[in-house]
Amino acid sequence: MLRVVGSSVKLPVVNLTSSRGISAGIVKLNKKVAGPPPVITVKKDEPLVTPPSIEPIPITEEIVIEEKPKKKFSLFGFLFKSTLLLAAVYGGTLYVATKNDKVMDFVVDNQLPYHEELLDVIENTTKEDLEDAWYNLKGKASNVKLPTKDDIEQMTTKLEHKGEDLLKETKKKFTEATEKGRKGTELTPGEQLQRPVEVESITRNVTRLPLIELSSDVANSVDSSVRQTIASLNNFIQSIDATPLASSNTALVKSIDASLNQLAKKLNSLTTSFDEEVKNKLKKSQTELFSAYTKKELDLTENLLHQYNAEKAQLEKKLNQRLEQEVKATRDAVSQAATNAVSMVRIEQTKSFEKLVAEKINEERNGRLANLQKLNDKITELEKFAVSFENLIVKTHERNLIQRSVAALKNALLATPDVDATPKSITPYLETLAQISTNDEVLNLALRDLAPLVSQESTHSILTNAQLLSRFEQLAPELRSSSLLPPNAGLLGHLSSLVFSKLLLPVKGVKADGKDIESVIARIESSLVRGNLDVAVEEAANLKGWTRRLANDWVVDARKRLEVEFLLNLIESESRLL
């Protein structure tokens, strides 16, 4: 607000909040937009009052800022904030308990409320569960429809109609209650004239016929049907009293009363006799039932005694068996304990006897048998020498057997066989050698590689050097002719190679650098003559094309002989090292 100081003119204070509230109310009720409040313009340069001629008094402005009123204390807000803070602290404590063992021990020891369920929720809840819950809540919130402006207007109109109806009903009930509460004196003169005329009743004494009444000794034992009959007769008498001739029927009423009393006495006597008969029959039936009950009780008692005796006998039997088992087990335990005690005594006696004997022997050893220790040491050394000498003899014998077996196997495989001799299998030689060399790994490995090479061979199947040389000499012409074949030779090529191979001049001597077929054949023959089978096999294996294919069988046989020779030489060398 603005206030002018130093002048007699005061500006009106305009409350914007109140004007806004009034304008909003006008808009809601009349649906018309109210104009803004008038604005008062104040000129700051010109004073509102004409100043005196001596000194002009300046106008100072002071802006007063109104302080906002302090909020009142809200109990609901305090409780809500406290609950929210406590829930956050409690949830944080339980979450820290899942990560820290000390906090978990504190929670478990103090038995915080619902800590097990909340810990289970915290440990088992994942990020996916929270996302699913958020999506579900979001979907439910999206399904909620907020009321539109038309719905709000309809609701307000309904509330207005209901309020009017409620006021009408309240006024109606209030007027009815006031009309009922009025007394006759409070009525108006017109209402008093409209009231009906009241007539006063006049009573007089009239003689009536006597009613039927039962005597006191019969009244308590009369049946209800008789009482109903008497009541109906009394009603009939009262109806007669209403007629003008009631006095002439008094004798009739008395006679009816006498007959009803007699009837009541007879009924009472019949009832008494019936009750006595019923009592007698009840006593008789009670006696019969008591006798039957007694008989049944005796039967049940006898049956229970029989069952009791049977159960008792069975329990006694089981108890006796159990006692026998326990006695037997105790007897066995006692006998075993006694046996163990006797055994311990014997062991102790044996130990003491051995100790005594050892002491006596030590005394004798220190006395008469002083040199017995030296003799024992010499005997021990002699035993060691005998054992080592025996091992040496065994190894020497094994070595001799292995060398003999290897020599026999080598002679059978590599020696030149006689023409008239029959071929023999190599398997017995291998079995003998395998039985002898069971403790040497090198011999076992060599025999393991040698067995598949010669298991299917005989003494005549391994070719000698001379046989290999003769076979190669027979193979040489084919090698010469195949060396002259073109890459894709036909019949004419084979015939021409066969003819031209006859024209080739054989090479004498060894040419180390020669790569032609004649030089290779010459080197192979020279190596075979000198006994260098490995060099000859290497030269033949280096051949290419048709010449290599023709020489393949010869190379296989030569390699087999080389492998057998190598393995036999290895076995022989290893046997010498044993």
Swiss-Prot record:
Subcellular location: Mitochondrion inner membrane
Presence of the UniProt keyword Transit peptide in the record: yes
Record keywords: Coiled coil, Membrane, Mitochondrion, Mitochondrion inner membrane, Transit peptide, Transmembrane, Transmembrane helix
GO biological process per UniProt: cristae formation
Stretches in topological domain Mitochondrial matrix: 30-74
Highest rank taxon of the organism: Eukaryota
Coiled-coil region: 294-392
Keyword Flavoprotein: no
Residues on Mitochondrial intermembrane side: 98-578
TM region(s), chain numbering: 75-97
Segments of skewed composition (Basic and acidic residues): 174-185
Primary subcellular site in the record, as a coarse category: mitochondrion
One Pfam family matching this protein: Mitofilin
Transit peptide location: 1-29
Region (Disordered): 174-193
Gene Ontology CC, one term: MICOS complex
Membrane topology qualifier: Single-pass membrane protein
Subunit structure: Component of the mitochondrial contact site and cristae organizing system (MICOS) complex.
Family: Belongs to the MICOS complex subunit Mic60 family.
Described function: Component of the MICOS complex, a large protein complex of the mitochondrial inner membrane that plays crucial roles in the maintenance of crista junctions, inner membrane architecture, and formation of contact sites to the outer membrane. Plays a role in keeping cristae membranes connected to the inner boundary membrane. Also promotes protein import via the mitochondrial intermembrane space assembly (MIA) pathway.
Protein name: MICOS complex subunit MIC60
Source organism per UniProt: Lodderomyces elongisporus (strain ATCC 11503 / CBS 2605 / JCM 1781 / NBRC 1676 / NRRL YB-4239)
